[in-house]
Amino acid sequence: MAVTMRQMLEAGVHFGHQTRFWNPKMAPFIFGHRNKIHIINLEKTLPMYNDALKYVRQLAANRGTILFVGTKRQSRDTIAEAAQRAGMPYVNARWLGGMLTNFKTLKVSIKRLKDMEAAVEAGELEKMSKKEALLFEREIAKLQKSIGGVKDMGGIPDAIFVVDVGYHKIAVTEANKLGVPVIAVVDTNHSPEGVDYVIPGNDDASKAVALYTQGVADAILEGRANAVNEVVQAVRGGDGDEFVEVNGEA
């Protein structure tokens, strides 16, 4: 379902930051200011948001992986819920330096987490002393919080979706180094540089964050559904072909 400009207004997408904190590189996307707060031009935001979703659909249709990134308090739960619904990896605690550029090290931690989870399933905790079990539980909880959202990410993602590029500067920089496309919400106090699909908008309001993330999750599911429908149509199209038996005898 397409998002309307009214929905963006109701979610507060148009509210930027205080004018004294603005980044001049966001000037093309600013409508004006009110009470020393920049107002984002939604006539620019809406088509750019739709362009980003179009790219997301295409990527999902081709079985691409999109990593959701949002570690700010007001976006953590929303990011996790949307990513899980779309079957995509996510980072909603803290971005660990090297998550992309040093993926080999991350894989070691992921293996450790999976091994520990398997041990819990096998009832290994019951064989430990109270102290050992406590230390084990602390470690697994720490790993689940930091990398639980990426434990099923088999490799470098095909794109990352970021809410607040300033807060997640390291993630954007790592993606840029590896040539991984960046889809991001950029507020008036940050630069859109390094972002392939810019969504000019409020990156603080929970309603606005929910609108972006739910839209991206929906686009992923739509892209996958479209790909499945195309396969079904192709198979059905072949049913109508006349079957001709080839006789090998001369």
Swiss-Prot record:
Pfam families: Ribosomal_S2. The keyword Protein biosynthesis does not apply. GO terms for cellular component: cytosolic small ribosomal subunit. SUPFAM superfamilies: Ribosomal protein S2. InterPro entries: Ribosomal_uS2 (IPR001865), Ribosomal_uS2_bac/mit/plastid (IPR005706), Ribosomal_uS2_CS (IPR018130), Ribosomal_uS2_flav_dom_sf (IPR023591). The keyword Phosphoprotein does not apply. Gene3D superfamilies: Glucose-6-phosphate isomerase like protein, domain 1, Helix hairpin bin. GO terms for biological process: translation. One of its GO terms (molecular function) is structural constituent of ribosome. Keywords: Ribonucleoprotein, Ribosomal protein. Disulfide bonds: none annotated. Belongs to the universal ribosomal protein uS2 family. This is Small ribosomal subunit protein uS2. It comes from Paraburkholderia phymatum (strain DSM 17167 / CIP 108236 / LMG 21445 / STM815). The gene is rpsB.
